[in-house]
């Protein structure tokens, strides 16, 4: 999502079907963020959404990184890509994983900001290197 709005608008219940609509709403309730726009956007193509859901489930929550580190990586990617929606969504999710407001401010500064552990600095540096 950019300042101008989404390039592809999230689908309505009619666009995405009852199951995807329910998944997006339940996900939003569980995370405290409201209906998940990403789910409703990808859900416009049901096969894409199902494949993405399997993929994303292997990364989060089924990934090998601890949840806090996963959230730091997602926040850094969202910041570098200028994706305000994803950034704000994961600020909320990150709080549950132990990401503080100070961490969020440092994510914006990047891996050279003070206060990161050596491991966190490596993860954020990897994000920056993959981005550039």
Locations of the language-model features?
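Structural motif
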Residues: 64-69, 115-120
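Histidine/lysine/aspartate-rich catalytic loop segments that bind and position anionic ligands
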Residues: 91-117
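Conserved alpha-helical segments that form or flank metal/cofactor-binding pockets of metalloenzymes
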Residues: 69-71, 77-101
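Acidic, glycine/proline-rich low-complexity segments that act as flexible tails and inter-domain linkers
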Residues: 1-65, 95, 112
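Acidic/histidine-rich alpha-helical segments that form the ligand environment
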Residues: 117-132
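Generic structural signal for hydrophobic core residues of well-folded globular domains
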Residues: 42, 59, 77-81, 130-131
């Amino acid at each position: 999502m950019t300042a101008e709005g989404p390039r592809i608008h999230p689908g309505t219940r009619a666009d995405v079907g009852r199951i995807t609509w329910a998944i997006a709403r339940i996900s939003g309730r569980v995370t405290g963020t409201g209906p998940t726009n990403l789910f409703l956007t990808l859900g416009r193509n049901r096969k894409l959404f199902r494949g993405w859901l399997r993929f994303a489930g292997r990364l989060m929550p089924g990934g090998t990184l601890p949840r806090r580190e996963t959230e730091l990586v997602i926040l850094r990617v969202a910041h570098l890509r200028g994706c305000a929606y994803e950034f704000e969504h994961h600020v909320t999710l990150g709080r549950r994983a132990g990401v503080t407001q100070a961490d969020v401010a440092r994510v914006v500064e990047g891996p050279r900001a003070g206060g990161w552990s050596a491991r966190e600095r490596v993860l954020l540096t990897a994000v920056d290197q993959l981005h550039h």
